[in-house]
Amino acid sequence: QTPVGGTRAIVHEFVDGDPVALEAITPGLASSIGRAIAAVHALPTSVVSDVGLPQLRAIDVMRESLATLDRASETGLVPAGLLRRWELASEDQSLWQFTPTVINGGLSAGSFLSIGETVTGVLGWSRLQIADPARDLFWLLGSADAAVPESAFEAYHEARGIHDRELARRAVFAAELEVARWLLHGTTTRSTEITDDAVEMLHALLDRVHRDMTNPLTMEQDRPATLTDAHDLVDLGAPESVRLSPASASPASPSPASPGSNGSAATPPTPPTPRD
């Protein structure tokens, strides 16, 4: 690294691979993505804590979700049914019983480089932190192929060797709150186009929730979480901007570095053995 104009320039070893598009992800590539994300989450927390990066506890993640919910509620544009659904999820203690891990914090399909069905690199590390692992996985739910998130989550759990029982459900919750964040981005920037788009998506989400009462965000005791309601989000016809995480477009969220697929790309960090 070297000082450049009051900031730093960091040059990495060239990482070969093609940028990944969400609609082009196959179940095989999804499995490789799941394993790559698992490798990040298996890093020791000292990677983050030793350099003073953000560290969120499970209760902090819950409070962030509540803050987003409250801000969205204040707009008066979120259907009451969705607000109630999200409030119940926030109050469900089982949802927040997880161990925070190192996460990238800003993943989308475009974060990955691949050759064939193998991930070769991950781009953008400016949001590295300790937080909810579901945050790195929810974007996969935007795939039109149900086998994609299923393959990714299965490979992730297998690679981690730790089964986070409510991971899929928190990923669904995170995906739904992304629509709320898209709404907040529209109201904050006073963009009628974005706001109207978000409102339309919220009402479509409400319709889907009313049609399918078998997949609530809150769970009956001892019922295993599934990806069924996660994949149903695709039926909303979410625009590409939301599928690629609208929060990244919000001024309140720092933009992850997207330096391209050559010298500035970084391969996924290799965790030590044993992991964690």
Language-model segments: residues:
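ATP-binding pocket architecture of kinase catalytic cores
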Residues: 1-53
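An alpha-helical support segment within catalytic cores of ATP-dependent transferases
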Residues: 45-104, 265
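Active-site Asp-x-Gly
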Residues: 115-167
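Compositionally biased, intrinsically disordered low-complexity segments enriched
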Residues: 248-264
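Helix-rich C-terminal or lid/interface subdomains of diverse kinases
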Residues: 158-248
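Active-site acidic catalytic loop and adjacent metal/ATP-binding pocket
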Residues: 88-135
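Intrinsically disordered, compositionally biased tail regions
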Residues: 259-276
